[in-house]
A protein has these predicted regions:
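Flexible glycine-rich beta->alpha loop in the catalytic core of nucleotide-sugar glycosyltransferases
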Residues: 142, 187-188, 194
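Short secondary-structure boundary/capping segments
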Residues: 149, 190-191
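Domain-scale signature associated with acetyltransferase and cell-envelope carbohydrate enzymes
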Residues: 1-137, 160-162, 169, 179, ...
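A mid-sequence, solvent-exposed acidic-amphipathic segment
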Residues: 143-144, 148
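Glycine-rich NAD(P)-binding loop of Rossmann-like domains
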Residues: 149-159
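Short amphipathic alpha-helical patches
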Residues: 131-134, 151, 186-187
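A generic "structured core" feature
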Residues: 177-178, 182-188
Length: 214
């Protein structure tokens, strides 16, 4: 791992752990680098495990990115749950609005410059890989009227276990992705899917009975 001990922000790590975890925070389960901006810490963070260094925020991701110049942003006024051994790379932006809930399952990773914007409810399963430059967003932020009907501004997103999200993919409100699916790079994913082990693109299911190795 390119980033080492010298890149850890001791003050941010102490502040984060004691703010959210109280006495459990003395084990420093979350390690934060200097390039992470703790924009808003008014919300609630819960962990599956409080082992030292269990969660890493702001460390290296893919080798083709200049991680030294990437700024991660942590902006949580709602609720965030992180499973064991979740890795959040440099440049990742996480925003959880008031009364919203974001859950990321164990052994999942979010790569460089991806963004998760949660204003309702987003559930990400275990062993999920989110590649670089992705956007997962459960809200339109502006209400849309279709004829005489006002559409919902936000809808929950569900992503199952062992899903691989290719680079530069957008996952929008109301999406449901079953276990062990692949989201094609560059796709705009909408709608609900029920079939496991599929390759899904903007146009829908492209292949069936696919699998991938982490």
């Amino acid at each position: 791992m390119g980033k080492g001990i010298r890149d850890i922000s001791i003050l941010k790590t102490i502040r984060f752990n004691l703010r959210y975890f109280g006495k459990k925070g003395v084990y420093f389960p979350v390690i934060i680098t200097k390039n992470v901006i703790l924009k808003n810490m008014q919300g609630k963070v819960e962990l599956e495990s409080y082992k030292t260094g269990n969660i890493r925020i702001g460390f290296d991701g893919t080798g083709i990115c200049d991680v030294k110049n990437q700024r991660s942003i942590f902006d949580v006024t709602g609720s965030l749950f992180l499973g064991e051994n979740v890795k959040i790379a440099a440049g990742v932006k996480i925003g959880v609005g008031e009364k919203a809930s974001l859950k990321i399952g164990r052994e999942s990773s979010i790569n460089v410059n991806s963004q998760i914007i949660c204003m309702n409810n987003i559930s990400i399963g275990e062993g999920v890989i989110i590649s670089w430059d992705n956007l997962i967003m459960d809200s339109d932020f502006h209400q849309i009227q279709e004829q005489t009907t006002l559409k919902d501004v936000s809808k929950p997103i569900f992503i199952g276990d062992k899903v691989w999200i290719g680079c530069r993919t957008m996952v929008l409100k109301g999406v449901n992705i079953p276990n062990e699916c692949i989201l094609a790079a560059g796709g705009v994913i909408t709608g609900k899917y029920t079939e496991k082990n599929c390759l899904i693109s903007s146009a829908g299911i492209k292949k069936h009975n696919v699998s991938w190795i982490r």
